[in-house]
Amino acid sequence: MSQKSQFAYRSSKSIGLVNASENYASPPKFEAISEPARNACYSPNGKLFAYATATQVVINDTESGAKLTQLPAANTYELGFSPLGKYLSTWERPGKEADGTPKQNMKVWNTETGQLVFSFVQRNQTGWNLQYTCDESLAARLVTNEVHFYETGNMSKGPIAKLRVEGISDFALSPGQNHAVAVFIPEKKGAPASVRTYSIPNFNSPLSQKTFFKADKVQFKWNALGTSLLVLTQTEVDKSNKNYYGETNLYLLGITGQFDCRVDLDREGPIHDVCWNADSKEFGIVYGYMPAKTAIFDNRANVVSIIPPAPRNTLIFSPNSRYILLAGFGNLQGSIDIFDAANNMKKITTVEAANCTYCEFSPDSQFLLTAVTSPRLRVDNSIKIWHITGAPMFYEEFNELYQAFWRPRPLNPTLLQNALTSASLPSPPTPHASASKLAAKPSVKPAGAYRPPGARGQNSTFSYRREEIDVMSSGSANKHVNSSRQRVVPGATPVIDGNKKNNKKTKPAVKQVAQPTAEVSDEKKIRSLCKKLRAIDDLKSRLNNNEKLEATQVKKIESEGKVLAELKALGWTPDA
């Protein structure tokens, strides 16, 4: 594996940069940190890496790992680089200054000098960052009914252009060389929703537009060249009651305005995923009720390839456009299929990545990184790297892993051409020693029937209820059988009717059920109190980080002594 391949991770206790070579070591000048970090990201060109702690934001060079800049941006929760890495945006929670004015919580920094370039109030965390043109000459942000455009070299001067569209709720700048913007206006008072594209800064008339109903929100998906736009629409509620998550539709628009259409799909059901190929000539869709169907379309919405139905909901094209990944994540099993587009969509391998929450091709398209992260899943957190042939390359476990991702790298056109013309697959390199653990990891056993925590490790506490249901279902036809069985309430003293035969059967049953009931009650109390104690510890940690707490949260911290006293009364010890 090339030394240029690198990935980063953020866990509960550390930040790491790892050169993905045979020894999987950090860059020579990278200083490992042992304090928690709130976010981390690479610049899109892969040259810079930034992470935010409670007190500052640090920017590192990715090749050497050396620390370049420290920004005085405390309490930063979000980070985002401009396309060429010249600017870094930071976002912190909204608040007020000492004089009561809103705090300018969104800030833009120059990564070379560390100077603050621009700041403003940004209340919403969703869509918080500026959007840039590919050359970084312009930056844009959404305000009420307008998109404001700034010259990046002189943001403090204010917007140089404004696109006013009544009711606009979302926008997306084109990544192409010709500067363009797409905007979405949702349905209102019976009028249809619409998507329009404009050339910047000529806003007199749109380049293209499409109107449609059944659209409460959209996802914009430009191809890499910025010549075509996919618009995935979604309603909050499916009025036909066929889909719990609302109704989805897909539209394709050409930037010149000479072509637009709704992408017709031959199966009912939701659109699970849609994405462009890196060559900008094709896009793929996973759609329909499970098992879902996958189809590849050209840039005129004509089907060029179909992959057989399977329980999959995620589609990813490799950066070199040769490989197609289909996976079933979320509530599906976690199987990943990899297909070779250069060999008539032949399946290369299937990788089992149970509970995977993140999946990404390496920039050279030879490797796959899968990760299980918190808070989505708090068990089995790990990073796994696989070769494109399915061979395991690297494996590392974490107590709590929050992020893991490859360093971006511009694709070499020569490598792209070679990948598409070569009929053979690359051979896997020598794996890291940790890969043996991944290869030897046992398959997941069936979980079996669910049992409540208090009933685990002992006879079922629900056996009485099951027996009662069985008896009741037999009805009056078996009255002579029912008359010989006495109903017993768990934990209660049985009624003695003087019949020795019945007493012999009843007493053991009462003994089995009554004893665990008291134990379960105490266990539940201890678990509930321990949960309160953990919440108090978390609040104390936030208080130590100078976070402002609500009055109810402060009161909760003050109740720590009472909680500990109740736990000790139940026989709990800190080591238990």
UniProtKB/Swiss-Prot annotation:
One of its GO terms (cellular component) is cytosolic small ribosomal subunit. GO terms for molecular function: mRNA binding; ribosome binding; translation initiation factor activity; tRNA binding. Residues 422-461, 475-505 are annotated as: Disordered. InterPro entries: TIF2A (IPR011387), TIF_beta_prop-like (IPR013979), WD40/YVTN_repeat-like_dom_sf (IPR015943). Keywords: Cytoplasm, Initiation factor, Protein biosynthesis, Repeat, Translation regulation, WD repeat. GO terms for biological process: cytoplasmic translational initiation; regulation of translation. It is found in: Cytoplasm. Residues 475-486 have a biased composition (Polar residues). WD repeats lie at residues 71-119, 266-307, 308-349, 351-396. The keyword Glycosyltransferase does not apply. Pfam families: eIF2A. Coiled coil: none annotated. Functions in the early steps of protein synthesis of a small number of specific mRNAs. Acts by directing the binding of methionyl-tRNAi to 40S ribosomal subunits. In contrast to the eIF-2 complex, it binds methionyl-tRNAi to 40S subunits in a codon-dependent manner, whereas the eIF-2 complex binds methionyl-tRNAi to 40S subunits in a GTP-dependent manner. PANTHER family: EUKARYOTIC TRANSLATION INITIATION FACTOR 2A. Belongs to the WD repeat EIF2A family. This is Eukaryotic translation initiation factor 2A. It comes from Schizosaccharomyces pombe (strain 972 / ATCC 24843).
